[in-house]
């Protein structure tokens, strides 16, 4: 079988990261969570609001480590849990729309996929980061289901939230992601759309694995 890259795009809480991790594990590929990278930059900005974002980005050290599940390090510190907190979630779409931030991270992400064998999820993977990916998937789900998933995830992390609050946050993020000037969330022309509403993790994972095997 030939080595391939798999691009998985879609809106917030569509199940991209959960599915992408499982697909990568099943196919012995490398998983890259680009959303975590943007969240880490957002956290850095929240912690140093007085520093111009362009200067901040130039001096940030980001590392993804696949050890007991992927961990992300910001300037040497493990921020994998901190970047999932509500203040980061509220600000990540705004920070991700800044040109200098996207330029730095897209360059990093493209370097990661140069040797293939990568499953990468995000908002612009199939359209901007690796438009030449052998398999492109665009995952969607209803706003209600995505809010419920995020609610369960927050409970598991000990984060207080309500369904209505999360539904509003997701609708706001959808609008920001789809209307931003730089690399807006959009489906690549040759991407395969999968609606995960009402489907199990196992069902969607199996579907993408079969698509990947056909592309190898």
Swiss-Prot record:
Instruction: Name the EC number(s).
Output: 2.7.4.25
The UniProt record gives the binding positions of ATP as 10-18
GO CC annotation terms, alphabetical? cytosol
Q: Name one Pfam family in it.
A: Cytidylate_kin
Chief location of this protein within or outside the cell: cytoplasm
- Where found? Cytoplasm
Which keywords are on file for this protein? Answer: ATP-binding, Cytoplasm, Kinase, Nucleotide-binding, Transferase
Please name the GO terms of the biological process aspect recorded for this protein, alphabetically: nucleobase-containing small molecule interconversion; pyrimidine nucleotide metabolic process
What top-level branch of life does the organism fall under?
Answer: Bacteria
Reaction equation(s) it catalyzes: CMP + ATP = CDP + ADP; dCMP + ATP = dCDP + ADP
Drop me one GO molecular function for this one. ATP binding
Show the NCBIfam families listed in the entry: cmk
The identity of this protein, by name, is: Cytidylate kinase
The organism's taxonomic lineage, starting at the top: Bacteria, Bacillati, Bacillota, Bacilli, Bacillales
């Amino acid at each position: 079988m030939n080595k391939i890259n798999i691009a998985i795009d879609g809106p917030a809480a569509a199940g991209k990261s959960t599915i992408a991790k499982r697909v990568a594990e099943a196919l012995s590929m490398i998983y890259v969570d680009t959303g975590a990278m943007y969240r880490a930059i957002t956290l850095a900005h929240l912690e140093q609001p007085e520093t111009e974002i362009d200067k901040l980005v130039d001096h940030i050290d980001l590392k993804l480590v696949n050890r007991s599940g992927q961990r992300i390090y910001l300037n040497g510190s493990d921020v994998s849990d901190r970047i999932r907190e509500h203040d980061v979630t509220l600000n990540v779409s705004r920070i991700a729309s800044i040109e200098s931030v996207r330029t730095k991270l897209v360059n990093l992400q493209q370097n990661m996929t140069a040797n293939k064998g990568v499953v990468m999820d995000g908002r612009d993977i199939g359209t901007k980061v690796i438009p030449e990916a052998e398999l492109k998937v665009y995952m969607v789900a209803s706003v209600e289901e995505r809010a419920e998933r995020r609610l369960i995830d927050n409970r598991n992390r000990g984060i207080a939230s309500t369904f209505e609050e999360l539904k509003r946050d997701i609708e706001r993020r959808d609008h920001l992601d789809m209307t931003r000037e730089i690399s807006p969330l959009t489906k690549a022309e040759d991407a395969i759309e999968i609606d995960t509403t009402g489907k199990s993790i196992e069902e969607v994972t199996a579907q993408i694995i079969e698509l990947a095997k056909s592309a190898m």
